[in-house]
From Swiss-Prot:
Antimicrobial peptide. Belongs to the gastrin/cholecystokinin family. It is found in: Secreted. GO terms for biological process: defense response. Expressed by the skin glands. The keyword Secreted applies. This is Caerulein precursor fragment R4. Keywords: Amphibian defense peptide, Antimicrobial, Secreted. It comes from Xenopus ruwenzoriensis. The lineage of its organism: Eukaryota, Metazoa, Chordata, Craniata, Vertebrata. Coiled coil: none annotated.
Amino acid sequence: GFGSFLGKALKAALKIGANALGGSPQQ
């Protein structure tokens, strides 16, 4: 569903943001 897509997009954005800041991605 659309909610699942938003969840995946949000997690991907957080990973990219963490990598951009030089931090390790949290799981």
